[in-house]
Regions:
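N-terminal redox-cofactor-binding region of secreted/periplasmic oxidoreductases
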Residues: 1-612
């Protein structure tokens, strides 16, 4: 039997300085790899210690963007035992690498939901279904998302307050964003953002030639660059902060729970599948949860708080008897409270406008080896930040300076991209003919994905139970482009028209931009470039920006909302919902930061209610 030997596989040996350098390189690579997905960065799983009948002060269902913040702040009171029940496990090493964001979809960290087929959207996706990834992992969707820290704008929150939700106007909630923010040096020296908060934020400015040209192109059409995102004056282009800490994703499970794992009253139970909330005489008493193959009944002395997200929170409410009466009765579920759970769902729709560019638009290498090396050695380069994805645009078709209704995100793919591009095409779920076209057109040239984004949708969808089996996924009807006056489609077509203007600017023309035409048989019957063509295009290739909200929305009237302005479920005691599902209307931007703000504000209200 031969013995493994390094000498056997190489023609010569390294000695002296060269050997030392080689060993240093290997050690650096191993150290970098071991820092990714390190379980020591997370709380120890308390699940094996839980027994049937155990009692806690607060039971928080879901350890995502909102739930992590809520549990952290509640556990500041050492007299309160706070249990977080998380359906998933710890985030993987892959999740720590920002540039591999799309590679996490349809893994064990993703619930991997899909919408039900509808005739208004997702028509050129496989099976006419859009993929709706949601985080099934400690940290929730902060483990899967694009790491963009976007607050929304003042008008969003003032509108919430105008609907009767006292205390949710911009002036009342902006302090909670500041409390969350920990902007890292050197940006912390000049930024108006907070510097001592829970979540590390990095200011990133892409040095790709095309990024600077995009900024110049916007200025050539009269759109200003904003040095910082300004919720009170949001129109313009801006580089938003990223939830990244020294090249690694800063998910809430790691930074907001893991960094406080020394608190003995903050308990995290992983792989804990909640089946229902136990309610007696309209008072929440606890939960039924499966942990380690055992079904346990746990008690909450004070409150049960649902922070399971805009899909799972309404599902659990309905399984527990809170929801639309007719739907629950048809499934044999006893009705506790007739409320519009799962209704009024909103989401940001995006489309895909791919532009082929000349080679001088990009600077980083053609192959995957150099970015990987750069990341593992220095945790820098394209994998550390998603390139120019944090360069955002907020615009308005109606010249309303306070409330943008569309904007743009951007992806930049190098020639024959083997890192981000394949993940995007697979993750979105295009039919093969479109995915192949996208790939083939970008083999020899870099491609810029200009992504029109619908920021103030009028359309609404809904979540419905498929059965009363908790393991059955709910039915997701996105409702995209179903508003009666087709305002959403009109705004998205206007966004394409804006793109066309932008491409014609001198700043972009120097790259010989060429719009890649996707093969869509239904749309190819129409005049290419007409409004009718682009409307057809939207119904076929538009997809989600992964921002479902409003399925347990906040309000005063029971027939139009699920929770009151203090996030208490109407007419059910000791039960709250604290996540993006409570938004009366979706904010005009990415929803991760607002979800964390909701968790923070909820903790303040809960403390007021129990300590006053």
């Amino acid at each position: 039997m031969s013995t493994l030997s390094l000498n056997d596989t190489c023609p010569g040996n390294l000695h002296g300085t060269s050997a030392e350098l080689f060993l240093t390189l290997l050690n650096t690579l191993l150290t970098a790899k071991c820092s990714l997905g390190n379980p020591k960065n997370y709380p120890v799983d308390f699940g094996p210690n839980i027994r049937n009948g155990d009692e806690f002060d607060f039971i928080v269902i879901g350890g995502g963007s909102a739930g992590s913040v809520l549990a952290n702040k509640l556990s500041e009171n050492q007299d309160w035992r706070v249990l977080v029940l998380e359906a998933g496990g710890l985030p993987s090493a892959t999740s720590d690498i920002p540039g591999l964001m799309y590679n996490l979809q349809e893994t064990e960290e993703d619930w991997a939901y899909k919408t039900e087929p509808q005739n208004t959207s997702c028509l050129s996706m496989k099976n006419k279904q859009c993929k709706w990834p949601r985080g099934k992992v400690l940290g929730g969707s902060s483990v899967l998302n694009a790491m963009l820290y976007v607050k929304g704008n003042k008008a969003n929150y003032d509108h919430w307050a105008e609907l009767g939700n006292t205390g949710w106007d911009w002036d009342s909630i902006k302090e909670y964003f500041t409390e969350l923010e920990q902007v890292l040096p050197p940006a912390s020296e000049t930024t108006p953002l907070g510097t001592d908060g829970l979540l590390p934020l990095t200011k990133h400015y892409s040095n790709e030639p095309i990024k600077m040209s995009l900024q110049e192109a916007y200025e050539q059409v009269g759109i200003k660059y904003l040095e910082e995102q300004n919720p009170e004056k949001p129109i313009g282009t801006v580089d938003v902060p990223l939830c990244i800490d020294r090249g690694q994703r800063a998910n809430t499970g790691k930074k907001i729970l893991g960094n406080y794992q020394n608190r003995t009253n903050l308990l995290i139970s992983l792989h804990s599948f909640v089946q229902k909330i136990t309610i007696e005489e309209k008072v929440a008493k606890g939960v039924e949860v499966e942990i380690g193959g055992n079904l346990l009944k746990l008690k909450a002395k004070k409150e049960v708080v649902l922070s399971a997200g805009a899909i799972n929170s309404p599902q659990l409410l309905m399984l527990s008897g809170i929801g639309p009466k007719e739907n629950l009765q048809s499934l044999g579920i006893d009705v506790v409270e007739d409320l519009p759970v799962g209704q009024f769902m909103q989401d940001h729709m995006i489309s895909w406008h791919e532009i082929k560019l000349s080679l001088d638009a990009i600077r980083y290498p053609k192959g995957p080896a150099d970015p990987l090396y750069e990341y593992f050695i220095r945790q820098e380069g394209p994998l550390s930040s998603l390139s120019l994805t944090n360069f955002l645009t907020f615009l308005n078709t109606k010249n309303d300076s306070m409330w943008p209704d569309f904007g743009f995100h951007y992806f930049l793919f190098p020639p024959n991209d083997q890192l981000l591009g394949p993940g995007v095409r697979k993750g979105v779920g295009f039919v093969d003919s479109i995915a192949t076209t996208m790939s083939n057109e970008c083999k020899s040239n870099p491609c810029l994905m200009m992504i029109p984004t619908l920021l103030t949708p009028k359309s609404m969808g809904q979540i419905m139970l498929k059965s009363k089996n908790p393991r059955d996924y709910p039915l997701i009807y996105s409702g995209s482009f179903t508003d009666k006056d087709d305002e959403d489609i009109t705004v998205m077509v206007e966004a394409i028209r804006f793109n066309e203007r932008l491409i014609q600017t001198p700043a972009l023309q120097k790259y010989n931009p060429e719009v890649i035409r996707f093969p869509i048989p239904e749309c190819d019957k129409l005049e290419y470039g007409s409004d009718a063509y682009w409307a057809c295009f939207m119904r076929n290739v538009a997809s989600t920006l992964y921002h479902p909200t409003s399925t347990c929305r906040m309000g005063v009237q029971k027939n139009e909302s699920v929770v009151d302005p203090r996030l208490r479920v109407h007419d059910v005691k000791n039960l709250r919902v604290v996540d993006a599902s409570i938004m009366p209307r979706v904010t005009s931007g990415n929803t991760h930061a607002p979800s964390m703000m909701i968790g923070f504000k909820a903790s303040v209200m809960i403390k007021e209610d129990w300590l006053s």
